[in-house]
Amino acid sequence: MYVPAYGRAHADEGLLVYLEVCEHGAYDAARQLHALRLAGWFDDASGVLIGRTAAPDAEKMTQREAVADALGMLDVPIVLDADIGHTQPFLPLVNGASARVTVTDGVGVVTQTLG
């Protein structure tokens, strides 16, 4: 199902969007995140998790700046460097599960429930 439609149909309390940029450099990451934002992927988001990456920064843009450039105007919390994606420890998230994210003193916890 298309993500914006899923959020409207199934996520009454908001949608937690989680992504990672894998091996993409900062400019590619910014471009892809802008495209997702313009396509409506974050319209019903209540928060965004971005997985940690080993991908390179660009000469004039870091990975963090890429996320801020593309998503900084969203009025939702954005957590960077989450332990999800292609960088160890590869913590799994379950698509469609309910989730609660807390961040205290730079330490984040994601709690998921099924059903």
Stretches found by the model and what they are:
Residues A9-A11, W41-F42, L71-G72, P92-L93:
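Solvent-exposed alpha-helices and their adjacent loops that cap or buttress functional pockets
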Residues M1-L33:
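ATP/pyrophosphate-binding catalytic subdomain of soluble kinases
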Residues Y27-W41, Q63:
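A short, acidic, amphipathic alpha-helical segment used as a generic capping/interface helix at domain edges
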Residues R52-G115:
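ATP/nucleoside-binding phosphotransfer catalytic cores, i.e., glycine-rich phosphate-binding loops
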